C-alpha cells in the first residue's frame, strides 16, 4: 500500500496525477474549521491556509485519489466538536489525532487536557452516530476501530493492536 501525509498546501498537478496513477492514499492535514486550522497552520508569511488545503483536497478527489482528512485535536479544536464535525464530515474519512504536550512537561496555549479531549470525543461520537442513523455515514478511524473491537473484531489500526510493522518515512 502506498500512502503519504501532506499539509496540502502546495501540491502540483503532476504530483496529484502521480498519486492517482500509483493508487496512493493521501492523508491531508485539515484541523477542523477554517478558524481552528488557520490558528495553528498559517503559511510562512502568516496568512491563512485552510482554503488552499480545502481546494487541494477537492483536486485530489477529482483526480480519483483516496483522501483521509487528518485533524489534530488541540485545545482550540476540542472547544468546537460540532463545528469541527460539520466542517469535516463532507470529506467522509477522518482521523482525529490528539495533540499531546511534549515530554518537557510544559503546557502551551493550545494544550489539550484529558477532560477536553474526552468531551470532544463524546460530542463528536454523538454527531457520528446521528449521521449514521440518518443515512449519512462518516468514517472516523478511532470510532470505527473501537466499534469493531466491541463487536469482537480486530482493529485495522495497528496502534490499537499494540504492534505496527515497519514504515518507510522520507
Name each region found by the language model.
Residues 1-36, 43-55, 71-83:
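Canonical radical SAM enzyme core domain
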Residues 39-51, 58, 62-170:
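Radical SAM enzyme [4Fe-4S]-AdoMet core and its adjacent flexible, acidic
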Amino acid at each position: 500500500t502506498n500512502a503519504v501525509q501532506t499539509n496540502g498546501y502546495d501540491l502540483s498537478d503532476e504530483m496529484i496525477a502521480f498519486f492517482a496513477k500509483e493508487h496512493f492514499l493521501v492523508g491531508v492535514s485539515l484541523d477542523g474549521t477554517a478558524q481552528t486550522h488557520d490558528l495553528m497552520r498559517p503559511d510562512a508569511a502568516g496568512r491563512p491556509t485552510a482554503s488552499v488545503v480545502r481546494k487541494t483536497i477537492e483536486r485530489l478527489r477529482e483526480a480519483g485519489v483516496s483522501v483521509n482528512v487528518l485533524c489534530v485535536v488541540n485545545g482550540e479544536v476540542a472547544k468546537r466538536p460540532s463545528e469541527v464535525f460539520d466542517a469535516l464530515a463532507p470529506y467522509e474519512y477522518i482521523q482525529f489525532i490528539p495533540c499531546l504536550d511534549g515530554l518537557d512537561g510544559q503546557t502551551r496555549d493550545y494544550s489539550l487536557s484529558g477532560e477536553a479531549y474526552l468531551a470532544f470525543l463524546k460530542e463528536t461520537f454523538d454527531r457520528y452516530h446521528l449521521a449514521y442513523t440518518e443515512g449519512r455515514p462518516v468514517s472516523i478511524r478511532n470510532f470505527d476501530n473501537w466499534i469493531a473491537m466491541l463487536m469482537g473484531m480486530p482493529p485495522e489500526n495497528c496502534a490499537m493492536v499494540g504492534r505496527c510493522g515497519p514504515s518507510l518515512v522520507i
